[in-house]
Amino acid sequence: MLQHSLSQAEAQARLNLAESQDGFFAKVRGSATNRLARRNCTYEAWNDQSLAAKAAALLDPEDQVDIVILDPSAEGGMPHTRPGLICLPAYYPESKLKETLAHEMIHISQKRQPTLWAARASNEGWSPVREVLPEFWASRLRLNPDTFGTLYAWEKRYVPLPVYIREDKPILREIEVRWFDIKEGIVKGSPPTTFTQTHGPLGHVQAEHPYELWAYSK
């Protein structure tokens, strides 16, 4: 039996509420590079929310999360989370729903229980970054609604930086992870040896932030 889905107006209202809670797009608007990366993206609730009902049927009702279907161009067509919401692009393949929802529910937990996940970060060698990043690199960081808020350093020294490959023509899906060495004050192209020894070789989507690392290794 399919679950109830929100109307387009209800879905848009949930998005507006989420923005009032996390201020993600206020931050995007304050970043020239991130605004440019979303120049062809429309972040609005889609007129057909029926996919949300199919996705909701795969979740436990106790998860207490709403699913919103967005314009297919929103966030480059990438599923993501906002406070209390899982956001999926229109026309997302139903065959991928189960795996994607499991991934996004990890991010929902990270938003709802920040203290718990901060403790895990500390236990696994991560610490919040207090230092100011070099402006050249800070301006190129791709803002991600799933990890928005806190940068982490591996071994209190190495900060993964998900940066756009091209600053002049940034594309949301085209990033690379550089590593800022706090001690040396320089940015390196390869992860520290200890990180690779611990986690193995990772793609950029896993390496960009510990929250993504854990969501992909669910």
Residue ranges and their predicted role:
Residues M1-Y43, Y211:
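N-terminal mature-domain "stem" immediately C-terminal to a signal peptide or N-terminal signal-anchor/transmembrane
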Residues P79, R120-A121:
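Short, solvent-exposed loop/turn and secondary-structure capping segments
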Residues P61-V65, L70-A102, I106, K111:
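Active-site scaffold of zinc-dependent metalloenzymes
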Residues Q110-R120:
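Serine-dependent carboxylesterase/thioesterase catalytic core
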Residues S122-K218:
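Metalloprotease/metallohydrolase-associated module, dominated by Zn2+-dependent proteases
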Residues R29-P83:
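Auxiliary, metal-adjacent structural segments of Zn-dependent hydrolase domains
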Residues A45-S50, S95-K96, T100, V205-P210:
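Soluble non-cytosolic domains of exported or imported proteins
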